[in-house]
Design a protein with these regions (language model features):
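Basic-flanked hydrophobic alpha-helices used for secretion and membrane insertion
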Residues: 1-225
């Protein structure tokens, strides 16, 4: 999640189209997502020796910790428009307006910009890690887990107290690299996935489901067999 000026926004997976009522299975959503490449966060292969020599480190360093990320620039040293929105370098409302125009079959106002950013604009940007299991809160009265992802105050507090994910490096493909393993984007180490899985497994809702495998903890009813 990004968290700026007391406002949060899910950035991985990106929810730009979901905010318009388009589910991930929607054909329109799939088409638009592929056209605009809304997801900029990606996982690095575990063995960094496979690709690290293909890039020049322009600022900072490759991730050394689980909560560190690196920005991979294009061969020309640029970032995508979507990455600029994700990093807060361009107003996210501008993107939302374009998507809304597209979904309403209106003429999309696309203003091409050649914004210039320096490395300090990108380095040390932070995001918040929120475990999906924490979206749920136990209801003592009905003895079920309720999804609180639509509760803005609940989510705001959850995001605000989430773990920090920080961009610590910026890399660019070397001039002599004919092929590179990583496309442009924001990359996190594979250890972050392991961290999220371990944390999810220890969560109360998951533990309750494991210990009551015949009971659906979301409905309080037995699973149909």
């Amino acid at each position: 999640f990004s968290f700026t000026n007391e406002e949060y926004r899910q950035v991985n997976p990106d929810k730009t189209f979901a905010s318009l009522g388009m589910g991930s299975s929607s054909s329109s959503n799939s088409m638009m997502s592929s056209m605009m490449s809304t997801d900029v966060f990606k996982s690095m292969p575990k063995n960094t020796n496979l690709f690290s020599e293909q890039y020049d480190v322009k600022a900072g360093h490759w991730p050394k910790k689980t909560n560190e990320c690196v920005i991979v620039l294009t061969a020309k040293g640029k970032i995508s428009d979507m990455m600029a929105y994700t990093l807060g370098l361009r107003g996210i409302q501008e993107l939302d307006d374009m998507v809304k125009q597209f979904s309403n079959e209106e003429e999309v106002d696309v203003t091409l910009k050649n914004d210039a950013y320096n490395y300090q604009d990108l380095l040390n940007k932070t995001f918040k890690l929120v475990n999906a299991a924490d979206y749920y809160q136990y209801d003592q009265q009905y003895q079920i887990w309720k999804d609180k992802s639509d509760d803005q105050e609940y989510m705001k507090n959850l995001v605000q107290n989430g773990e920090d994910i920080q961009i610590v490096g910026i890399v660019q493909p070397k001039d002599d690299s004919s092929a590179t393993m990583l496309s442009t984007g924001i990359y996190y180490p594979s250890s972050l996935i392991d961290h999220v899985i371990k944390k999810s497994t220890k969560s109360e809702i998951v533990q309750q489901q494991i210990n009551n495998h015949n009971l659906n903890v979301f409905t309080g009813k037995a699973f149909d067999i």
